[in-house]
Regions:
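Active-site mouth of glycoside hydrolases
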Residues: 39-41, 53, 60, 68, ...
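Short beta-strand/loop segments at the ligand-binding rim of alpha/beta enzyme cores
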Residues: 293-301, 351-359, 364-367
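Glycine-enriched alpha-helix->loop->beta-strand junction motifs that scaffold or abut catalytic
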Residues: 296, 318-325, 349-354, 403-406
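Short, flexible/disordered intra-domain loops and linkers
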Residues: 184-185, 230-241, 368-389, 421-425
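Aromatic- and carboxylate-lined catalytic core of secreted/periplasmic carbohydrate-active enzymes
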Residues: 354-355, 362-369, 380-382, 389-480
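Substrate-binding surface in catalytic domains of secreted glycosidases
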Residues: 330-346, 363-365
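Ligand-binding face of N-terminal immunoglobulin V-set domains in extracellular IgSF glycoproteins
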Residues: 1-65
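Generic beta-sheet signal
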Residues: 218, 303, 358, 410-411
Length: 480
Protein backbone atom coordinates (compact mmCIF):
# COMPACT_ATOMS: atom_id res chain seq x y z
CA UNK A 1 0.00 0.00 0.00
CA UNK A 2 1.49 3.34 -1.08
CA UNK A 3 -0.98 5.88 0.43
CA UNK A 4 -1.17 8.76 -2.09
CA UNK A 5 1.66 7.37 -4.21
CA UNK A 6 4.11 10.08 -3.14
CA UNK A 7 4.21 9.61 0.61
CA UNK A 8 7.95 10.21 1.00
CA UNK A 9 7.31 13.82 -0.04
CA UNK A 10 3.81 14.40 1.30
CA UNK A 11 3.92 12.34 4.53
CA UNK A 12 0.51 11.07 3.49
CA UNK A 13 -1.19 8.61 5.83
CA UNK A 14 -3.95 7.51 3.46
CA UNK A 15 -4.82 7.19 -0.19
CA UNK A 16 -5.81 4.82 -2.96
CA UNK A 17 -2.46 3.87 -4.48
CA UNK A 18 -0.95 0.39 -4.55
CA UNK A 19 2.54 -0.13 -5.93
CA UNK A 20 4.58 -3.13 -7.01
CA UNK A 21 8.33 -2.49 -6.96
CA UNK A 22 10.48 -4.51 -9.33
CA UNK A 23 14.09 -4.53 -10.42
CA UNK A 24 15.01 -6.92 -13.21
CA UNK A 25 18.15 -9.03 -13.09
CA UNK A 26 18.41 -9.25 -16.88
CA UNK A 27 17.43 -7.13 -19.91
CA UNK A 28 14.63 -8.02 -22.30
CA UNK A 29 10.85 -8.33 -22.38
CA UNK A 30 9.13 -8.94 -19.04
CA UNK A 31 5.51 -10.02 -18.65
CA UNK A 32 3.37 -9.44 -15.58
CA UNK A 33 -0.01 -10.43 -14.18
CA UNK A 34 -1.71 -8.62 -11.30
CA UNK A 35 -2.93 -10.56 -8.27
CA UNK A 36 -5.26 -8.33 -6.26
CA UNK A 37 -7.44 -10.23 -3.79
CA UNK A 38 -9.18 -9.69 -0.47
CA UNK A 39 -9.87 -12.04 2.41
CA UNK A 40 -9.38 -12.01 6.15
CA UNK A 41 -5.65 -12.64 6.83
CA UNK A 42 -4.93 -13.16 3.12
CA UNK A 43 -1.74 -11.11 3.52
CA UNK A 44 -0.30 -13.50 6.09
CA UNK A 45 -1.78 -16.91 5.27
CA UNK A 46 -0.09 -17.82 2.03
CA UNK A 47 -2.41 -20.71 1.19
CA UNK A 48 -5.53 -18.51 1.12
CA UNK A 49 -6.66 -17.83 -2.45
CA UNK A 50 -8.75 -14.79 -1.59
CA UNK A 51 -11.58 -13.14 -3.51
CA UNK A 52 -10.51 -11.29 -6.70
CA UNK A 53 -10.89 -7.50 -6.61
CA UNK A 54 -12.26 -6.20 -9.90
CA UNK A 55 -11.10 -4.71 -12.23
CA UNK A 56 -7.50 -5.04 -11.09
CA UNK A 57 -7.04 -8.75 -10.44
CA UNK A 58 -5.85 -10.63 -13.49
CA UNK A 59 -4.67 -7.62 -15.48
CA UNK A 60 -1.73 -8.47 -17.71
CA UNK A 61 0.94 -6.54 -19.53
CA UNK A 62 4.56 -6.43 -20.56
CA UNK A 63 7.47 -4.01 -20.70
CA UNK A 64 11.02 -3.89 -21.99
CA UNK A 65 14.14 -3.56 -19.85
CA UNK A 66 17.24 -2.21 -21.59
CA UNK A 67 20.81 -3.20 -20.81
CA UNK A 68 22.12 -1.07 -17.94
CA UNK A 69 24.95 1.30 -18.72
CA UNK A 70 28.29 0.26 -17.29
CA UNK A 71 28.95 1.95 -13.97
CA UNK A 72 32.04 1.94 -11.73
CA UNK A 73 29.85 1.33 -8.69
CA UNK A 74 26.52 -0.25 -7.98
CA UNK A 75 24.87 -3.55 -8.67
CA UNK A 76 22.78 -2.63 -11.72
CA UNK A 77 25.21 -4.23 -14.17
CA UNK A 78 25.87 -7.31 -12.03
CA UNK A 79 22.48 -8.99 -11.89
CA UNK A 80 20.89 -10.33 -8.72
CA UNK A 81 23.07 -11.68 -5.91
CA UNK A 82 22.03 -15.24 -5.11
CA UNK A 83 22.89 -18.25 -3.02
CA UNK A 84 24.17 -20.92 -5.41
CA UNK A 85 25.04 -23.70 -2.98
CA UNK A 86 28.62 -22.54 -2.56
CA UNK A 87 30.58 -20.70 0.12
CA UNK A 88 30.06 -17.31 -1.55
CA UNK A 89 27.07 -15.57 -3.06
CA UNK A 90 27.21 -15.03 -6.82
CA UNK A 91 25.79 -12.40 -9.16
CA UNK A 92 23.52 -13.89 -11.82
CA UNK A 93 24.73 -11.53 -14.52
CA UNK A 94 28.45 -10.98 -14.08
CA UNK A 95 28.97 -14.38 -12.39
CA UNK A 96 31.24 -12.56 -9.96
CA UNK A 97 31.44 -13.97 -6.44
CA UNK A 98 30.73 -11.49 -3.66
CA UNK A 99 33.18 -10.83 -0.84
CA UNK A 100 32.02 -8.18 1.57
CA UNK A 101 33.64 -5.63 3.82
CA UNK A 102 30.98 -3.65 5.58
CA UNK A 103 29.75 -1.65 8.54
CA UNK A 104 27.89 -3.67 11.16
CA UNK A 105 27.57 -0.48 13.21
CA UNK A 106 25.63 1.51 13.96
CA UNK A 107 22.77 -0.93 14.39
CA UNK A 108 20.66 2.23 14.72
CA UNK A 109 21.51 3.38 11.19
CA UNK A 110 17.82 4.16 10.54
CA UNK A 111 17.31 6.14 13.77
CA UNK A 112 17.43 9.33 11.74
CA UNK A 113 15.67 12.59 12.50
CA UNK A 114 14.81 13.16 8.83
CA UNK A 115 12.59 10.07 8.65
CA UNK A 116 8.89 10.53 9.37
CA UNK A 117 7.54 9.06 12.60
CA UNK A 118 10.96 8.43 14.12
CA UNK A 119 11.55 9.27 17.78
CA UNK A 120 14.09 8.43 20.47
CA UNK A 121 12.66 6.68 23.51
CA UNK A 122 15.97 6.60 25.41
CA UNK A 123 17.73 9.83 26.42
CA UNK A 124 21.15 8.23 26.01
CA UNK A 125 20.39 7.11 22.45
CA UNK A 126 19.27 10.23 20.56
CA UNK A 127 18.30 10.33 16.91
CA UNK A 128 21.05 10.85 14.36
CA UNK A 129 21.62 13.85 12.14
CA UNK A 130 24.49 12.24 10.21
CA UNK A 131 25.94 15.77 10.29
CA UNK A 132 29.58 14.73 9.69
CA UNK A 133 28.54 13.33 6.31
CA UNK A 134 26.59 16.30 4.98
CA UNK A 135 29.81 17.21 3.18
CA UNK A 136 29.61 13.92 1.26
CA UNK A 137 26.20 14.56 -0.30
CA UNK A 138 26.57 15.54 -3.97
CA UNK A 139 24.41 17.47 -6.39
CA UNK A 140 22.07 15.02 -8.10
CA UNK A 141 21.90 12.70 -5.11
CA UNK A 142 18.44 11.94 -3.71
CA UNK A 143 16.78 13.79 -0.86
CA UNK A 144 13.19 14.35 0.20
CA UNK A 145 10.99 17.15 1.51
CA UNK A 146 13.24 20.07 0.54
CA UNK A 147 16.62 18.65 1.44
CA UNK A 148 15.98 16.05 4.09
CA UNK A 149 18.13 12.93 4.00
CA UNK A 150 21.38 14.52 2.87
CA UNK A 151 23.39 13.40 5.90
CA UNK A 152 22.58 9.71 5.59
CA UNK A 153 22.86 9.74 1.79
CA UNK A 154 26.26 11.38 2.23
CA UNK A 155 27.29 8.67 4.69
CA UNK A 156 26.51 6.01 2.07
CA UNK A 157 28.52 7.97 -0.51
CA UNK A 158 31.50 8.06 1.82
CA UNK A 159 31.40 4.33 2.54
CA UNK A 160 31.17 3.48 -1.15
CA UNK A 161 34.09 5.77 -1.95
CA UNK A 162 36.20 3.91 0.62
CA UNK A 163 35.45 0.56 -1.01
CA UNK A 164 32.93 -0.57 1.59
CA UNK A 165 30.25 -2.74 -0.05
CA UNK A 166 27.83 -3.61 2.77
CA UNK A 167 25.75 -1.92 5.46
CA UNK A 168 23.83 -3.50 8.33
CA UNK A 169 20.86 -2.19 10.31
CA UNK A 170 17.97 -3.31 12.49
CA UNK A 171 14.62 -2.16 11.03
CA UNK A 172 12.76 -3.10 14.22
CA UNK A 173 14.55 -2.39 17.52
CA UNK A 174 11.57 -1.47 19.71
CA UNK A 175 12.37 -2.44 23.29
CA UNK A 176 16.00 -3.03 22.35
CA UNK A 177 19.30 -1.25 22.90
CA UNK A 178 18.38 1.63 20.63
CA UNK A 179 14.58 1.58 20.94
CA UNK A 180 14.25 4.13 18.14
CA UNK A 181 13.53 2.26 14.88
CA UNK A 182 10.32 0.56 13.74
CA UNK A 183 8.51 0.37 10.38
CA UNK A 184 5.08 0.78 11.99
CA UNK A 185 3.44 4.06 12.96
CA UNK A 186 4.38 3.20 16.55
CA UNK A 187 5.75 0.17 18.43
CA UNK A 188 2.30 -0.37 19.92
CA UNK A 189 0.62 -0.59 16.49
CA UNK A 190 2.21 -3.77 15.19
CA UNK A 191 -0.21 -4.18 12.27
CA UNK A 192 -0.22 -0.56 11.07
CA UNK A 193 2.74 0.33 8.85
CA UNK A 194 4.05 3.83 8.17
CA UNK A 195 3.91 4.40 4.41
CA UNK A 196 5.83 7.67 4.30
CA UNK A 197 8.64 6.48 6.57
CA UNK A 198 9.04 3.30 4.55
CA UNK A 199 9.11 5.24 1.29
CA UNK A 200 11.89 7.37 2.75
CA UNK A 201 13.78 4.23 3.79
CA UNK A 202 13.32 3.06 0.21
CA UNK A 203 15.05 6.16 -1.15
CA UNK A 204 18.03 5.38 1.08
CA UNK A 205 18.11 1.69 0.14
CA UNK A 206 17.84 2.49 -3.58
CA UNK A 207 20.81 4.82 -3.28
CA UNK A 208 22.78 2.23 -1.32
CA UNK A 209 22.29 -0.30 -4.10
CA UNK A 210 23.24 2.27 -6.74
CA UNK A 211 26.48 2.82 -4.81
CA UNK A 212 27.23 -0.89 -4.52
CA UNK A 213 26.20 -1.37 -0.89
CA UNK A 214 24.71 -4.75 0.09
CA UNK A 215 21.76 -4.47 2.51
CA UNK A 216 21.98 -6.61 5.65
CA UNK A 217 18.50 -6.65 7.21
CA UNK A 218 18.91 -7.79 10.82
CA UNK A 219 15.19 -8.13 11.26
CA UNK A 220 15.16 -8.05 15.08
CA UNK A 221 17.47 -8.20 18.09
CA UNK A 222 17.75 -10.36 21.17
CA UNK A 223 15.82 -7.93 23.37
CA UNK A 224 12.66 -8.19 21.24
CA UNK A 225 12.80 -11.58 19.52
CA UNK A 226 10.91 -13.45 22.26
CA UNK A 227 10.07 -13.30 25.96
CA UNK A 228 13.41 -14.70 27.14
CA UNK A 229 15.52 -12.08 28.89
CA UNK A 230 19.19 -11.40 28.26
CA UNK A 231 22.07 -13.67 27.42
CA UNK A 232 21.05 -16.47 29.83
CA UNK A 233 17.57 -16.56 28.30
CA UNK A 234 15.69 -16.41 31.59
CA UNK A 235 11.87 -16.30 31.46
CA UNK A 236 10.48 -12.79 31.21
CA UNK A 237 8.18 -10.57 29.18
CA UNK A 238 9.08 -8.43 26.16
CA UNK A 239 6.06 -6.38 25.01
CA UNK A 240 7.79 -5.53 21.72
CA UNK A 241 8.29 -9.18 20.72
CA UNK A 242 6.21 -9.93 17.63
CA UNK A 243 3.69 -12.64 18.50
CA UNK A 244 5.60 -13.15 21.74
CA UNK A 245 8.39 -14.82 19.79
CA UNK A 246 6.22 -17.11 17.66
CA UNK A 247 5.45 -16.97 13.92
CA UNK A 248 2.01 -15.42 13.97
CA UNK A 249 0.10 -12.61 12.31
CA UNK A 250 2.40 -9.81 13.51
CA UNK A 251 5.62 -11.47 12.41
CA UNK A 252 4.23 -12.73 9.10
CA UNK A 253 2.97 -9.26 8.24
CA UNK A 254 6.35 -7.78 9.19
CA UNK A 255 8.14 -10.12 6.80
CA UNK A 256 5.59 -9.45 4.07
CA UNK A 257 6.01 -5.69 4.37
CA UNK A 258 9.81 -5.94 4.23
CA UNK A 259 9.77 -8.28 1.24
CA UNK A 260 7.06 -6.38 -0.64
CA UNK A 261 8.73 -3.01 -0.17
CA UNK A 262 12.42 -3.90 -0.35
CA UNK A 263 12.78 -7.45 -1.66
CA UNK A 264 13.24 -6.24 -5.25
CA UNK A 265 16.70 -4.91 -4.36
CA UNK A 266 19.49 -6.85 -6.07
CA UNK A 267 21.88 -7.51 -3.18
CA UNK A 268 20.65 -8.22 0.33
CA UNK A 269 20.09 -10.85 2.98
CA UNK A 270 17.40 -11.45 5.57
CA UNK A 271 18.83 -12.15 9.03
CA UNK A 272 16.37 -13.88 11.40
CA UNK A 273 17.79 -11.89 14.27
CA UNK A 274 20.78 -10.53 16.14
CA UNK A 275 21.84 -12.78 19.04
CA UNK A 276 18.70 -14.78 18.35
CA UNK A 277 17.28 -16.86 21.19
CA UNK A 278 14.12 -18.27 19.63
CA UNK A 279 13.64 -22.02 19.50
CA UNK A 280 14.90 -24.13 16.58
CA UNK A 281 11.27 -24.82 15.67
CA UNK A 282 10.43 -21.13 15.35
CA UNK A 283 13.70 -20.39 13.58
CA UNK A 284 12.87 -23.06 11.01
CA UNK A 285 9.33 -21.74 10.61
CA UNK A 286 10.55 -18.17 10.09
CA UNK A 287 13.13 -19.21 7.49
CA UNK A 288 10.56 -21.35 5.67
CA UNK A 289 8.00 -18.52 5.61
CA UNK A 290 10.54 -16.07 4.20
CA UNK A 291 11.66 -18.63 1.63
CA UNK A 292 8.08 -19.20 0.45
CA UNK A 293 7.18 -15.51 0.39
CA UNK A 294 10.31 -14.00 -1.18
CA UNK A 295 10.05 -14.35 -4.98
CA UNK A 296 13.74 -13.53 -5.37
CA UNK A 297 15.08 -16.25 -3.04
CA UNK A 298 17.42 -13.94 -1.18
CA UNK A 299 20.06 -15.29 1.17
CA UNK A 300 18.72 -16.08 4.69
CA UNK A 301 21.01 -16.19 7.74
CA UNK A 302 20.93 -16.14 11.53
CA UNK A 303 23.13 -14.46 14.16
CA UNK A 304 23.90 -15.89 17.58
CA UNK A 305 25.76 -15.20 20.79
CA UNK A 306 29.34 -16.54 20.41
CA UNK A 307 28.98 -19.10 23.19
CA UNK A 308 25.59 -20.30 21.90
CA UNK A 309 26.63 -21.15 18.34
CA UNK A 310 27.16 -24.81 19.15
CA UNK A 311 23.57 -24.91 20.41
CA UNK A 312 21.90 -22.71 17.78
CA UNK A 313 23.46 -23.76 14.47
CA UNK A 314 23.53 -27.60 14.44
CA UNK A 315 19.70 -28.01 14.40
CA UNK A 316 19.56 -25.69 11.37
CA UNK A 317 22.25 -27.24 9.16
CA UNK A 318 21.58 -29.08 5.91
CA UNK A 319 17.97 -29.79 4.98
CA UNK A 320 16.79 -29.14 8.55
CA UNK A 321 16.07 -25.50 7.62
CA UNK A 322 15.91 -23.08 4.70
CA UNK A 323 18.88 -21.12 6.03
CA UNK A 324 21.71 -20.56 3.58
CA UNK A 325 24.31 -19.11 5.89
CA UNK A 326 25.53 -17.94 9.27
CA UNK A 327 26.16 -14.41 10.50
CA UNK A 328 28.90 -14.98 13.07
CA UNK A 329 29.66 -13.03 16.22
CA UNK A 330 33.02 -13.96 17.71
CA UNK A 331 35.93 -12.47 19.57
CA UNK A 332 38.17 -10.76 17.01
CA UNK A 333 40.90 -13.38 17.41
CA UNK A 334 38.51 -16.34 17.01
CA UNK A 335 37.15 -15.41 13.58
CA UNK A 336 39.32 -17.84 11.63
CA UNK A 337 38.68 -20.92 13.75
CA UNK A 338 34.94 -20.39 14.04
CA UNK A 339 34.49 -19.60 10.34
CA UNK A 340 36.28 -22.83 9.43
CA UNK A 341 34.09 -24.72 11.91
CA UNK A 342 30.76 -23.68 10.39
CA UNK A 343 31.83 -23.92 6.77
CA UNK A 344 33.01 -27.47 7.35
CA UNK A 345 29.95 -28.38 9.45
CA UNK A 346 27.59 -27.10 6.75
CA UNK A 347 29.50 -28.94 4.03
CA UNK A 348 29.29 -32.16 6.03
CA UNK A 349 25.53 -31.62 6.49
CA UNK A 350 25.05 -31.47 2.72
CA UNK A 351 24.34 -27.76 2.15
CA UNK A 352 27.27 -25.39 2.10
CA UNK A 353 26.62 -22.22 4.09
CA UNK A 354 27.86 -18.75 3.24
CA UNK A 355 29.62 -17.74 6.46
CA UNK A 356 30.59 -14.17 7.37
CA UNK A 357 32.05 -12.58 10.48
CA UNK A 358 29.56 -9.81 11.24
CA UNK A 359 30.35 -8.80 14.83
CA UNK A 360 33.58 -8.81 16.80
CA UNK A 361 34.11 -9.08 20.53
CA UNK A 362 34.79 -7.85 23.07
CA UNK A 363 31.38 -6.22 23.25
CA UNK A 364 32.69 -2.95 24.67
CA UNK A 365 35.47 -2.61 22.09
CA UNK A 366 34.84 -4.25 18.75
CA UNK A 367 36.80 -2.55 15.98
CA UNK A 368 38.56 0.53 17.42
CA UNK A 369 38.76 3.91 15.69
CA UNK A 370 41.89 4.90 13.80
CA UNK A 371 44.89 6.22 15.73
CA UNK A 372 44.58 9.98 15.97
CA UNK A 373 40.83 10.14 15.36
CA UNK A 374 39.76 12.97 17.69
CA UNK A 375 42.81 12.23 19.84
CA UNK A 376 42.13 8.49 20.16
CA UNK A 377 45.26 6.40 20.72
CA UNK A 378 44.15 3.64 18.37
CA UNK A 379 44.40 1.06 21.15
CA UNK A 380 41.43 -0.75 22.68
CA UNK A 381 41.96 -2.28 26.11
CA UNK A 382 40.84 -5.77 26.95
CA UNK A 383 41.63 -7.18 30.39
CA UNK A 384 45.43 -7.51 30.46
CA UNK A 385 46.13 -6.66 26.83
CA UNK A 386 45.58 -4.09 24.13
CA UNK A 387 44.70 -4.50 20.47
CA UNK A 388 44.32 -2.21 17.47
CA UNK A 389 43.12 -2.07 13.89
CA UNK A 390 46.09 -4.13 12.72
CA UNK A 391 45.01 -7.03 14.92
CA UNK A 392 41.55 -6.72 13.38
CA UNK A 393 43.07 -6.61 9.90
CA UNK A 394 45.21 -9.71 10.43
CA UNK A 395 42.96 -11.94 12.50
CA UNK A 396 39.39 -10.84 11.76
CA UNK A 397 39.53 -9.67 8.14
CA UNK A 398 42.16 -12.00 6.71
CA UNK A 399 41.39 -14.70 9.25
CA UNK A 400 37.81 -14.87 7.94
CA UNK A 401 38.69 -14.76 4.25
CA UNK A 402 41.47 -17.32 4.56
CA UNK A 403 39.04 -19.62 6.37
CA UNK A 404 36.82 -19.59 3.29
CA UNK A 405 34.46 -16.99 4.71
CA UNK A 406 32.62 -14.55 2.47
CA UNK A 407 33.62 -11.39 4.29
CA UNK A 408 33.21 -9.20 7.35
CA UNK A 409 31.16 -6.38 8.79
CA UNK A 410 32.75 -4.28 11.53
CA UNK A 411 31.14 -3.69 14.92
CA UNK A 412 32.18 -0.56 16.86
CA UNK A 413 31.64 -1.65 20.49
CA UNK A 414 29.80 0.39 23.10
CA UNK A 415 32.59 2.25 24.93
CA UNK A 416 34.82 3.64 22.21
CA UNK A 417 34.31 6.84 20.18
CA UNK A 418 31.63 6.61 17.48
CA UNK A 419 30.23 3.41 18.98
CA UNK A 420 27.55 0.95 17.91
CA UNK A 421 24.58 3.04 19.04
CA UNK A 422 26.00 6.53 18.63
CA UNK A 423 28.12 6.45 15.48
CA UNK A 424 27.49 9.26 13.01
CA UNK A 425 30.97 9.50 11.49
CA UNK A 426 32.25 6.56 9.45
CA UNK A 427 35.58 8.38 9.03
CA UNK A 428 36.39 7.12 12.51
CA UNK A 429 37.42 3.77 10.94
CA UNK A 430 38.77 5.01 7.60
CA UNK A 431 42.00 3.04 7.77
CA UNK A 432 40.08 -0.18 8.45
CA UNK A 433 37.90 0.48 5.41
CA UNK A 434 41.02 0.88 3.28
CA UNK A 435 42.49 -2.39 4.54
CA UNK A 436 39.18 -4.09 3.82
CA UNK A 437 39.13 -2.78 0.26
CA UNK A 438 42.62 -4.15 -0.36
CA UNK A 439 41.51 -7.61 0.80
CA UNK A 440 38.26 -7.64 -1.18
CA UNK A 441 39.96 -6.33 -4.32
CA UNK A 442 42.51 -9.13 -4.02
CA UNK A 443 39.81 -11.80 -4.00
CA UNK A 444 37.73 -10.07 -6.66
CA UNK A 445 40.74 -9.89 -8.97
CA UNK A 446 40.45 -13.59 -9.71
CA UNK A 447 36.99 -14.54 -8.43
CA UNK A 448 35.55 -14.94 -11.95
CA UNK A 449 37.73 -18.01 -12.18
CA UNK A 450 35.81 -20.92 -10.68
CA UNK A 451 38.97 -22.00 -8.87
CA UNK A 452 38.47 -19.34 -6.16
CA UNK A 453 35.20 -21.00 -5.24
CA UNK A 454 36.85 -24.42 -5.25
CA UNK A 455 39.50 -23.32 -2.76
CA UNK A 456 39.09 -24.34 0.88
CA UNK A 457 40.89 -23.68 4.11
CA UNK A 458 43.85 -26.07 4.18
CA UNK A 459 45.71 -24.96 7.28
CA UNK A 460 46.95 -28.54 7.51
CA UNK A 461 49.27 -27.78 4.59
CA UNK A 462 51.09 -25.24 6.75
CA UNK A 463 51.07 -27.38 9.91
CA UNK A 464 48.18 -25.55 11.58
CA UNK A 465 45.61 -28.25 12.23
CA UNK A 466 44.22 -26.30 15.21
CA UNK A 467 43.28 -23.37 12.95
CA UNK A 468 44.92 -20.87 15.29
CA UNK A 469 46.22 -17.49 14.16
CA UNK A 470 49.83 -18.52 13.60
CA UNK A 471 49.40 -18.99 9.84
CA UNK A 472 46.59 -19.52 7.35
CA UNK A 473 46.28 -21.43 4.09
CA UNK A 474 43.51 -21.24 1.49
CA UNK A 475 44.15 -23.68 -1.33
CA UNK A 476 43.00 -26.10 -3.95
CA UNK A 477 45.70 -28.76 -3.55
CA UNK A 478 47.60 -29.35 -6.75
CA UNK A 479 46.23 -26.17 -8.37
CA UNK A 480 46.70 -23.06 -6.23
Amino acid sequence: FAADGNAAETSSESGTKWRADFRSDKPGKWNYIVSFVKEKQVAVELQLAGTPVSPFDGKRGSFMVAQAKQSPTGFLTEGRLQYVGKRCLQFTGSKQYFFKVGADSPETLLAYKDFDGTIARKKKVPLKTWGPHLQDWKSGDPAWQNGKGKGLIGALNYLAEQGVNSISFIPYNAGGDGDNVWPMISPDEKLHYDCSKLDQWQIVFDHAQAKGLFLHFKTQETENDDHKVGHPGNPGHAPAALDGGELGVERKLYYRELIARFGYQLALNWNLGEENTQTPRVQREMAAFIKELDPYDHHVVIHSYPDQQDKVYPPLLGDQSELTGASLQNHWDQAHRRTVQWIEASKKAGKMWVVCNDEQGPADGGVPPDPGYKGFSGKAKEKQREYDLHDIRKHTLWGTLMAGGAGVEYYFGYKLPENDLGCQDFRSREQSWKYGKIAVDFFKSFSRDVIIEEMRCHDDLVANTKHDNSRYCLAKPGKL
